[in-house]
Amino acid sequence: MSSTVEFHDRMLSLGLARVAEQAALASAKWVGRGDEKAADQAAVNAMREQLNKLDIQGVVVIGEGERDEAPMLYIGEEVGTGTGPGVDIALDPLEGTTLTAKDMPNALTVIAMGPRGSMLHAPDVYMEKLAIGPGYSEGLVTLDMPAATRVSALASEKGCSPADITVCILERPRHQEMIEEVRSTGASIRLITDGDVAGVMHCAEPEKTGIDMYMGS
């Protein structure tokens, strides 16, 4: 069947929820058991099994790695029944393997889907991330800005002092200069050991999480 069959996101959303649910349940059995690889493999197996039940012509564009690095859900792998719309898929069956193994919060199952050709085929490299909460002006902060400028811009629009801003950053040596620059503004930093997808999501509800911005690579 042609891969140009119309893409209906509402029709696929329940199927994707099932895919994510089964991957999460499979990895949950390994919470706190100190085995990152087993937790990840359980999630991969479950996600792949469920994806292959969906009526899609799916191609993994962001996955577990290149074909020679990952036996399943590798970049370029075709999934689904082979009928239905052609789709691109970005996934991480278990984002936060260390968090899972240590029974720590913020491990997630992540999957996104779009029409064929709609997703960037990104290589396995560090990419800059920047997120703020809702309600701010478009373009208020950008990747081109120094970290301190981002904090000042956000504080100005929020109507508060930089000291009232909290930034979430992944604790890695490569971020040390950024951490120092943010702290120089008076802003506080919530360092996380893993799980930067969750860190980005925390920005969506700053009144609950206390996090105003995420930045890092």
Describe the role of every protein-language-model region.
Residues 1-90, 152, 197-198:
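N-terminal subdomain of lithium-sensitive/metallo-dependent phosphomonoesterases centered on the IMPase/IPPase/PAP
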Residues 52-53, 78-84, 92, 100-104, ...:
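Solvent-exposed alpha-helices and their adjacent loops that cap or buttress functional pockets
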Residues 115-150, 154-158:
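Glycine-rich phosphate-binding loop plus the immediately following alpha-helix
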Residues 144-217:
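An extended, acidic
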